[in-house]
């Protein structure tokens, strides 16, 4: 492709709306343009990267035995009501009615549609196992689209669905997809780590996320510094070490704490450590009041709480509603004396001796609080967020936390959808059984952003060779006929050798060409000038390493191929 013909509107300045590097560089390099919040158009260079990633995905998925299909973006409400997710998916789902008043949504995911697709076709155990995948647009009404392609309202996703006779078969399908995903990301030239994850609204049994480690990532990953344990913080656990109760238990006492609502204020006012505090977090769980308790030096993990409660909606109680639901006040709510409120506590709360909690009276707290003696809870369980320095649940190592970008997610759905939607098969004995399912997703457009977050410098993008829009860029410098002639010859020779090449034939200064080449991140840059031609060489630079080479004009194709073989 000649750059004089290429639609590539680069920008010199960083757009104000772009917060993260990938968004900044995709706008500056002319890969994308914004239509409205969270909705983007892909320009030629950006779309070539998309097609490269899709090509890798298709090849690996086909090699794994999966078959490609294409399902609609518009879904009927009936299917989602069958699965029970029409309401549970919440405001992320964009719903609408047609002119006849029938309800539809724009598909945020395709479990319901794929289950409907196979339930009338799979009749016998002989039809299983089966794995179907698609690469399709998804739509989710994100409350705050941000970070460019990392959190957008419309995005391209590869989603696959496995269908097996039993859980043993699902385990095999899951491992095949786990391996396939690892291979996809390796072929894309990315460093990705698989971590245990929460299943969320997808439901099901086990789940793993594939994360690109990056400071701009919205997800926090907890991992052990000694073993291979890694999990999304939403799912992560730490070893529970029971505290020794060697302190004399004191009588309960109510004390005045004027205006002291926060943990750090109470620590200072009462001269007590935060681990003595019982932090109470008030929610309405599907309209029912729930009080969650964690130690004052811990943070509540809402995902763990939601999973235990198994509710559709968990809403923090606003200040003015405390008297109505808790007969208490914001900042002073506590578990003692509460009626008609479900109390759930982290297991570390049970070990507190002579602690502090709200007295359900404005400007007052209880001291010398002892769980079990002073209040009862429905359940003690792990509902705290892990933090750095916690002990690994599997070894003697300690937990570290880093940010990451989720680029893939796999789930063992089990029979969640097949049972609710009647997707069954007949086994060898003629008995009807629910199909056991798995779901596997890769965020194609998000993968583009993650690749840039992991591969860039102060000058621009550094594309991994496998997903670069072009492999080589030729920069003819100067106006001599011999320079342009040799650049044209090399351009045509590279094309004849199936090497994807850009020829910067624009009438621009050398500095502009160099800057644009670095910005768009083509792996190998070839510079042709009169001085180098006088020496019989072409100057080559590898974008990723910055290393320079001189290659012979006569053996240019052979030398370029050799250089490309060593480019990552």
Swiss-Prot record:
GO terms for molecular function: aminoacyl-tRNA deacylase activity; ATP binding; catalytic activity, acting on a protein; proline-tRNA ligase activity; transferase activity. The keyword Nucleus does not apply. It is an enzyme of class 6 (ligase). The keyword Phosphoprotein does not apply. InterPro entries: aa-tRNA-synt_IIb (IPR002314), aa-tRNA-synth_II (IPR006195), aa-tRNA-synth_II/BPL/LPL (IPR045864), Anticodon-bd (IPR004154), Anticodon-bd_dom_sf (IPR036621), Pro-tRNA-ligase_IIa (IPR002316), Pro-tRNA-synth_IIa_bac-type (IPR004500), Pro-tRNA-Synthase_IIa_type1 (IPR023717). It comes from the Bacteria. Its EC number is 6.1.1.15. One of its GO terms (biological process) is prolyl-tRNA aminoacylation. It catalyses: tRNA(Pro) + L-proline + ATP = L-prolyl-tRNA(Pro) + AMP + diphosphate. Belongs to the class-II aminoacyl-tRNA synthetase family. ProS type 1 subfamily. NCBIfam families: PRK09194.1, proS_fam_II. Consists of three domains: the N-terminal catalytic domain, the editing domain and the C-terminal anticodon-binding domain. Homodimer. This is Proline--tRNA ligase. It comes from Halothermothrix orenii (strain H 168 / OCM 544 / DSM 9562). The lineage of its organism: Bacteria, Bacillati, Bacillota, Clostridia, Halanaerobiales.
């Amino acid at each position: 492709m000649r750059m004089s013909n290429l639609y590539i509107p680069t920008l010199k300045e960083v757009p104000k709306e772009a917060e993260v590097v990938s968004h900044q560089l995709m706008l500056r390099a002319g890969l994308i343009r914004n239509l409205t919040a969270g909705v983007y158009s892909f320009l030629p260079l950006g779309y070539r990267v998309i097609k490269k990633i899709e090509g890798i995905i298709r090849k690996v998925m086909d090699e794994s035995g999966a078959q490609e299909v294409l399902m609609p973006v518009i879904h009927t409400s009936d299917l989602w009501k069958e699965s029970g997710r029409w309401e549970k998916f919440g405001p992320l789902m964009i719903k609408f009615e047609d002119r006849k008043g029938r309800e539809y949504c724009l598909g945020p995911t395709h479990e319901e549609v794929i289950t409907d697709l196979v339930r009338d076709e799979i009749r016998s155990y002989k039809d299983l196992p089966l794995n179907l995948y698609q690469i399709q647009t998804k739509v989710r009404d994100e409350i705050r689209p941000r970070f460019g392609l990392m959190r957008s309202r419309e995005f391209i996703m590869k989603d696959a669905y496995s269908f097996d006779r039993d859980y043993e078969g699902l385990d095999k399908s899951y491992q095949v997809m786990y391996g396939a995903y690892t291979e996809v990301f390796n072929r894309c030239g990315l460093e990705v780590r698989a971590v245990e994850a929460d299943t969320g609204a997808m439901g099901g049994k086990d789940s793993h996320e594939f994360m690109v480690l990056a400071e701009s990532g919205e997800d926090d990953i907890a991992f052990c510094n000694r073993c291979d344990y890694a999990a999304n913080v939403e799912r992560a656990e730490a070893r529970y070490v029971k505290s020794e109760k060697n302190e004399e238990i004191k009588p309960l006492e109510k004390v005045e704490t004027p205006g002291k609502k926060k943990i750090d204020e109470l620590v200072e006012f009462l001269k007590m450590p935060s681990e003595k505090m019982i932090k109470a977090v008030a929610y309405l769980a599907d309209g029912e009041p729930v009080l969650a308790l964690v130690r004052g030096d811990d943070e509540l993990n809402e995902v763990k709480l939601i999973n235990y409660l198994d509710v559709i909606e968990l809403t923090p109680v606003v200040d003015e509603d405390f008297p109505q639901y808790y007969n208490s006040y914001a900042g002073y709510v506590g578990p003692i004396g509460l009626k008609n409120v479900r109390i759930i506590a982290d297991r570390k709360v049970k070990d507190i001796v002579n602690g502090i909690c709200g007295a359900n009276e404005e400007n007052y707290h209880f001291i010398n609080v002892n769980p079990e003696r002073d209040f009862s809870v429905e359940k003690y369980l792990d509902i705290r967020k892990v933090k750095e320095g916690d002990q690994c649940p599997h070894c003697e190592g300690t937990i570290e936390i880093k940010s990451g970008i989720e680029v893939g997610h796999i789930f063992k759905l089990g029979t969640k959808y097949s049972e609710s939607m009647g997707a069954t098969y007949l086994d060898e004995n003629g008995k009807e059984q629910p199909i056991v399912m798995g779901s596997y997703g890769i965020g194609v457009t998000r993968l583009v952003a993650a690749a840039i977050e992991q591969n860039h410098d102060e000058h621009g993008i550094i594309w991994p060779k496998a997903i670069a829009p072009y492999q080589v860029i030729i920069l003819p410098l100067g106006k001599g006929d011999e320079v342009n002639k040799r650049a044209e010859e090399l351009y045509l020779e590279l094309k004849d050798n199936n090497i994807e090449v850009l020829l910067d034939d624009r009438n621009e200064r050398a500095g502009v060409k160099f800057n644009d080449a670095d910005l768009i991140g083509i792996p190998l840059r070839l510079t042709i000038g009169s001085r180098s031609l006088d020496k019989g060489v072409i100057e080559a630079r590898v974008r990723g390493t910055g290393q320079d080479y001189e290659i012979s004009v006569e053996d240019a194709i052979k030398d370029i191929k050799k250089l490309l073989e060593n480019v990552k």
